[in-house]
Regions:
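Proteins enriched for Cys/Gly/acidic motifs involved in redox and nucleic-acid/cofactor modification
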Residues: 1-157
Length: 157
């Protein structure tokens, strides 16, 4: 399968999309740089602000409109607004943060060798042409601030 990856939001989303790219490549999928060439588009969404929520919906709709690809949505918008995200892309194409690691298994294994098991940290050098890698230090939050969606979208830290 040819898969295009995009994200809205923070550096954590960027780190996760790069890890997702590595996981998909390990399963024999092809990551493409042109969404028009993709069979699937995966969007890692954000909802930390109302604008981020709107941007997430806008990006998803644009790919639905402008490509022939199936659009999968994951990330904070999907976690915080599960029903709306499922209505936007379909329930089977909507993955909350808790289910994000299951996305690569959704695709059949392609022509990839079985991965070797190395016992060291492999930096996620994704398709974003960055010279730096990200290491996830924390995810989520243990507080219950009334004005913040982080706990809902990301869960406990």
């Amino acid at each position: 399968m040819k898969i295009y990856l995009d994200m809205v939001g923070c550096r954590l989303n960027q780190s996760e999309i790069e890890k997702l790219a590595l996981d998909l490549l390990a399963r024999g999928q092809e990551i493409v740089t042109d969404p028009a060439a993709a069979d699937y588009v995966i969007v890692n969404t954000c909802c930390v602000t109302a604008k981020a929520c709107a941007d997430s919906r806008k990006v998803i709709r644009r790919y639905q409109r402008e490509t022939g690809a199936q659009v999968l949505a994951t990330g904070c918008y999907v976690s915080a607004f599960t029903r709306q995200a499922a209505e936007l892309v379909g329930e089977d194409l909507s993955f909350p943060n808790a289910d994000k690691d299951a996305i690569p298994q959704r695709f059949p294994r392609g022509n990839a060798a079985e991965p070797l098991d190395f016992n060291f940290l492999k930096p996620a050098l994704g398709a974003r042409s960055r010279t730096r890698s990200f290491i996830k230090v924390q995810e989520g939050c243990d507080n219950y601030c009334t004005y913040c969606l982080t706990r809902i979208a990301r869960g406990k830290s």
